[in-house]
Amino acid sequence: MIVTVTMNPAIDKTIDVETFVHGGLNRVKHIIMDAGGKGINVSKTIKALGGDSIATGFLGGNNGNAIANMLAIDEVNAEFVTVDGETRINTKIAEADGTLTELNEAGPEISEEELSKLEDQLMQYAKEGTWFVLSGSVSSGVPKTIYGDIIRKVHEKGAKVFLDADGELFTQSLAAKPDVIKPNREELEKYIGADHSLTEEELLHIGNELLEQGIGTVIISLGHEGALFLTKEQSLKCPAISVEVHSTVGAGDALVAAFTYGMDKGEDFEVCARLGIATSAGAVSTEGTKPPTRDKVDELIQLVKPIKL
């Protein structure tokens, strides 16, 4: 069973323009509205791959109702805690050349009572055989230690956790030893306070240090270059697949979804890595944050050629 947790979901509003003119008039070509937030994107992608998950987190107000309706249409199992505040809207301005400008709202204030309800709900799912995906930002009122707290509690019940967060949410959670993490190059540069762009050799060194700290699997996203997949037993580099890019929004979430889906099904590590890269490539070839079809992923996975490191 896979449970995704989206602490700060959003309606993703993607606006297509030819070229965005700062301070000038922009004519809109097309608008797409999707249920968004990193965990929600993961759940939608798992569904597209043929799997099931339970999407949890916080929803509130008219925007929250709209997201719930969108998830119902997509046949995604949703069990969110209802909050008093209004779920946010994240606006993404997509230009014809692939440039993306994002305007993300802060999200509602979460009360201690609402947070406690969610934690109680998560513990109902916590058991051996359950994968939790903790991803994305948190709203005001939620402590930066929340992911680490959840990891420790569900680990006691035998569950596993894929953590996809950055900044303080990432650093505060490492001591809890999540089973899988997925930082990108920029996040690791921030994590160690680097004053230069890290080389692949340096990234591998940091990844191995994280493994020594007790992390089970470290996936380092390299953007258009692919990703590194590291465990103590094996290390792979999966170069990215060349596809026509429509939107990079949700590409990382697609990788998280596919890798977790594969692990939940008991697939081999290399198979999970290949599935992650193929699904991520499929995601960037779709509009907005819509996941790729399973047929598209099956087509792309044939092109993924892992390199053993």
Region locations from a protein language model:
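Glycine-rich phosphate/adenosyl-contacting loop at the front of the ribokinase-like
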Residues: 1-56, 64-66
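Residues that scaffold the ATP/ADP-binding catalytic core of kinase and kinase-like folds
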Residues: 14, 103, 173, 191-192, ...
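Short glycine/proline- and charge-enriched loop/turn segments
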Residues: 18-27, 184, 189, 236-240
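Conserved N-terminal subdomain of the carbohydrate kinase-like
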Residues: 24, 48-129, 299-309
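Short, conserved phosphate/pyrophosphate- and ester-handling motifs at nucleotide-, phospho-/glycolipid
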Residues: 46, 184, 252
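Conserved phosphate-binding/catalytic region of the ribokinase-like
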Residues: 153, 171, 200-309
